[in-house]
A protein has these predicted regions:
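Short, amphipathic alpha-helical "recognition" segments used to contact nucleic acids or chromatin
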Residues: 45-57
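A cyclin-like helical interaction fold
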Residues: 1-43, 50, 63-69, 73, ...
Length: 91
């Protein structure tokens, strides 16, 4: 479950509670559109957190999120693109 991974990753890179909640909302919205199943939960959580950081103005890179989650930057980038497209996000 990617939602359970959000606090684990967030604690490693010190993001706000507000940003964590935003990431959880991104994941829930993606789940409604069936864009989460079959994807690595850690990669999905990292990408949702990256999107939330951008939206909340927290300066974190894809590399920061990838390292905190133990996934590659390519995974974060691919999930980010997928989420952005499915949710019509302007980030």
């Amino acid at each position: 479950d990617p939602i359970r991974n959000v606090p684990k990753i967030a604690s490693k890179i010190a993001v706000s509670e507000r940003t964590q909640q935003r990431a959880i909302k991104v994941i829930k919205d993606a789940e409604k559109k069936r864009a989460v199943s079959g994807k690595d939960p850690m990669g999905m959580a990292a990408s949702a957190l990256y999107i939330a950081c951008v939206l909340e103005g927290e300066k974190k890179t894809q590399k920061d999120l990838a390292e905190a989650a133990g996934v590659t930057e390519v995974t974060v980038r691919n999930r980010y693109r997928g989420l952005k497209e499915v949710l019509n996000l302007d980030v």
